[in-house]
């Protein structure tokens, strides 16, 4: 089953997450099919902390991918931010 979830990167005490489409049997930070965005929870003020390719998320969900709860929350937040800016 395909799932879109967070893959952790960064260093100790400085997390950085990639939003990836991957098989649910793969490890959290393991092999993935496509990187669809990133999330930086400790980004400095004025820098971009979240970017998601919403068209690619829609493509993967249309092909049966599930969103993890954290990714679902981030997608809602980002789509509201994008629609407010437009």
From Swiss-Prot:
Pfam families for this protein:
Ribosomal_S16 (PF00886)
Residues in the signal sequence: none
| Keyword annotations | Ribonucleoprotein, Ribosomal protein
Q: Which GO terms describe its cellular component?
A: cytoplasm; small ribosomal subunit
Q: Which InterPro entries match?
A: Ribosomal_bS16, Ribosomal_bS16_dom_sf
Q: Gene3D superfamilies from the xrefs? A: 3.30.1320.10
Name the domain of life this protein comes from: Bacteria
For the keyword Ribonucleoprotein, the answer is yes
Which BP terms does GO give this entry?
A: translation
GO terms assigned for molecular function: structural constituent of ribosome
Q: Which residues form a coiled coil?
A: none
Please tell me whether the keyword Ribonucleoprotein is annotated for this protein.
yes
- Give the record's family classification: Belongs to the bacterial ribosomal protein bS16 family.
Q: Known PANTHER family for this protein? A: 30S RIBOSOMAL PROTEIN S16, SMALL RIBOSOMAL SUBUNIT PROTEIN BS16M
Protein name as catalogued: Small ribosomal subunit protein bS16
Species, as recorded: Bordetella pertussis (strain Tohama I / ATCC BAA-589 / NCTC 13251)
The protein's gene is named rpsP
